[in-house]
Amino acid sequence: MTRRAGTAKTAATPAAAQSRSGKKSPTVSKAISLPPAAPRRARGAVPAAVPATTAAAALPQGGGEVRIIGGQWKRTRLPVARLAGLRPTPDRVRETLFNWLGQDLNGWRCLDAFAGTGALGLEAASRGAARVLLVEQDAGLVAQLHALCQRLEASAVTVRRGDGIAQLRQCAPGSLDIAFIDPPFEDSALFAPALKAAAAALAPQGFVYLEAASAWSDDELVPLGLALHRHLRAGAVHAHLLRLADAAAQPVAPP
């Protein structure tokens, strides 16, 4: 049974969350490079520029579990099924991402288009997001997400089996504060349509999180309506925080 999103608290916009830090956020920060991540499960090979044998060795491998890093469910364990293509976002990448976004996501509206273990969306819900939609195609993972949300009493989280890109396209303009885009690395045809659909649904000061096997540049992103805000590399994983191309040209206002 799909769980419905809870009643939203007074919304705190992404811009407001950043302003509480008392610091200006640069339009584009310098890329951060982290040492290679501990092995986890790979969803696929990195682009053809990297030999397949090298890619298979470099990408995260393995099942086991990951943990929610912050918020009300801090240290909660999330099972990682031994399923071909399942590649949860490494803990330290999620930690950096939510340091960028801020620890308090009170009122945010989120969509995790390729949910998998649900780590990204549940991390947002743990930090106060008002509505989180987890979209996943695999029936087994959907059942696992339903059970997990029931155990956590995660009333703000809805789990839906389906196509993440189609779900993004159904979102009204301005209805999302963040979209998490983390498709299987080998399915390169998914990236551009997902990013374009996310941009169309994004609130003016919202964000898109993109995880990929290689870095995306503004030359690739701007035609899709987005621009790079932050980037880091952790082993074979490239994490990008994106904003709407028009919004990225404007620095975040000071408090």
Language model segments and positions:
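Class I S-adenosyl-L-methionine-dependent methyltransferase catalytic core
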Residues: 1-255
